[in-house]
């Protein structure tokens, strides 16, 4: 199979979207490289290159003899990630200038998770610090699957996003920081349920997610 110029980036983006938004793989499960090659019409070379890139982004892990795996996720892991995310966003809100302006309405066509990630990306951009932008983008990627679980667990998910966006659009820095902290505290209380959901376990299932 001959890979045309640009195939590597196309395969990377396709695999990333698939693994974050479409795949039913659970934490700790193995990535099937031949299946990805068939799915995206690419040879194993760009597929493996894309997977190594995702390992670098901490969206996958690679272990000798086991290949590529969906990262295992424990409650402390997810708690740390939520706390890292709120620290980044509160810092961004504290140092934000007025640009780019944030509309009180999410971009047309965005789903609930995309609308939230768009808001957080815009808050990071307003900090004027490219490292904050990269860090928030990376945290959003790693939190994408947990946010899919949040949609099932938080009926007011979209209302929360609209409230945060409204505060950001109004330029209420103090109120926005307080709302961001409160939002993430609610998520921290849900960590056990989110981790169980990602492992395919119900609240009544006596099994514990693998450590």
Region annotations inferred by a language model:
Residues 2-12, 114-121, 144:
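Long, contiguous secondary-structure blocks with strong helical propensity
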Residues 71-128, 166-178:
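All-alpha effector-binding/dimerization core of bacterial HTH-type transcriptional repressors
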Residues 84-95, 117-158, 189-192:
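Hydrophobic, amphipathic alpha-helical faces that serve as interaction scaffolds
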Residues 27-28, 63, 103-105, 132-136, ...:
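Short, hydrophobic secondary-structure boundary micro-motifs
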Residues 1-95, 210:
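Short linear motifs at protein or domain termini
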Residues 148-211:
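C-terminal all-alpha effector/ligand-binding and dimerization domain
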Residues 51, 77, 105-107, 124, ...:
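A ubiquitous short alpha-helical element
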Residues 5, 44-48, 75-82, 129, ...:
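Amphipathic, non-membrane alpha-helical segments in soluble helical-bundle scaffolds
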């Amino acid at each position: 199979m001959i890979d045309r110029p640009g195939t590597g980036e196309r395969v990377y983006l396709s695999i990333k979207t698939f693994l974050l938004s479409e795949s039913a793989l659970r934490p700790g499960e193995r990535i099937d490289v031949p299946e990805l090659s068939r799915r995206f019409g690419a040879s194993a070379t760009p597929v493996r290159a894309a997977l190594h890139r995702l390992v670098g982004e901490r969206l996958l892990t690679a272990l000798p003899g086991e290949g590529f795996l969906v990262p295992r996720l424990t409650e402390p892991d997810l708690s740390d990630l939520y706390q890292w995310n709120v620290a980044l966003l509160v810092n961004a809100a504290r140092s934000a200038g007025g640009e780019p302006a944030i509309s009180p309405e999410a971009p047309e066509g965005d789903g609930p998770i995309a609308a939230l990630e768009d808001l957080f990306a815009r808050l990071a951009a307003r900090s004027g610090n490219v490292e904050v932008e990269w860090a928030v983008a990376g945290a959003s990627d790693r939190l994408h699957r947990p946010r899919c679980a949040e949609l099932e667990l938080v009926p007011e998910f979209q209302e929360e996003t609209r409230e945060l966006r409204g505060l950001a659009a109004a330029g209420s820095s103090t109120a926005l920081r307080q709302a961001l902290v409160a939002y993430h505290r609610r998520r921290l209380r849900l960590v056990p349920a989110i981790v169980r959901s990602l492992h395919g376990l119900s609240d009544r299932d006596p099994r514990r997610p693998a450590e």
